[in-house]
Amino acid sequence: MRVLGENMAKNIDDKLVLAISSRALFDLSESHKVYLSSGVEAYRQYQIEHEDEILAPGDAFPLVEKLLSLNSRLGRARVEVILVSRNSADTGLRVFNSIHHYGLAISRAAFVGGRSPYPYLKAFGCDLFLSTHAEDVRAALDAGFAAATILSGGASRAASDELRIAFDGDAVIFSDESERIYQSGGLEAFQAKEREAAREPLRGGPFKGFLAALNLLQREFPDDDCPIRTALVTARSAPAHERVIRTLREWDIRLDESLFLGGLTKSAFLEAFAADVSFDDQAGHCELAREVVATGHVPHGISNEPPI
């Protein structure tokens, strides 16, 4: 395993840190087919033979590009993107050639030679981990990090220069405590509990910390000229909205838009919001959303537990 950037300044405590896999950042579908069909050595040889060929952007590329652009807007480095890859440094050279080609300010990386990179997330001070490898994402979530599996699909690049991120509520920003009541007792039991606990803040979910860090970054821009916009897109509706609003108020976290859809299909609303990425715990919601926006599946909570 080799870590790049180790001689650079070590303090990244004041930055929002995104760790991203090479397959989430770039389109490595052709080389991945070689790996699946012919094994590691054939993959290595393929990458070396093609290392001067620039990779096409992957599903999370626009998100990374917009995040890094915030540094120039602020005049200082407040966002750090780190490449964490199952490649070796040898096979990863093509990825760094592509990073250089696109002018992405990514200098730190961990190439772990076929193993999961998640053990290095803490050392890098990671706020969010994005990967196409579901097992790595689950391991990161279990270790307490915000993490999502980036799904490939028909999503087109969001046209706006504004960075737009959409979040589901239960099991993403919040814990899955309410979702468990809904799945065990149905809608009536869920709504009764939410009315009863309207003034009792929900526990935080895996993305609470990332949302808080993003919110702090937003506050560094003028209110009328902030290039970051966030949205809560939830299947909740009244009367279950009050507890959500009061919880966010208790946490001192602001969301720019809140959509309480009462069970309506989310994909049309995510497309209207023009999200650069949407995070949701429910696989069914993600399958629909991936056709219109870049989508991160958060395999957390009761909806992702194996049936008993």
Show where each model-derived region lies.
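Short alpha-helical
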Residues: 89-90, 115-116, 135, 238-239, ...
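Asp-based, Mg2+/Mn2+-dependent phosphohydrolase catalytic module
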Residues: 3-16, 134-165, 169-196, 208, ...
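Glycine-centered loop/turn motif at secondary-structure junctions
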Residues: 71, 103, 125, 144-146, ...
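Active-site phosphate-binding/coordination module
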Residues: 99-123, 127-134, 148, 252, ...
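Short beta-strand/turn micro-motifs composed of small residues
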Residues: 22, 85, 130-131, 234, ...
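Alpha-helical substrate-recognition element adjacent to the catalytic core
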Residues: 3-115, 159, 168-260
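Anion (oxyanion) recognition and catalysis
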Residues: 100, 122, 141, 249, ...
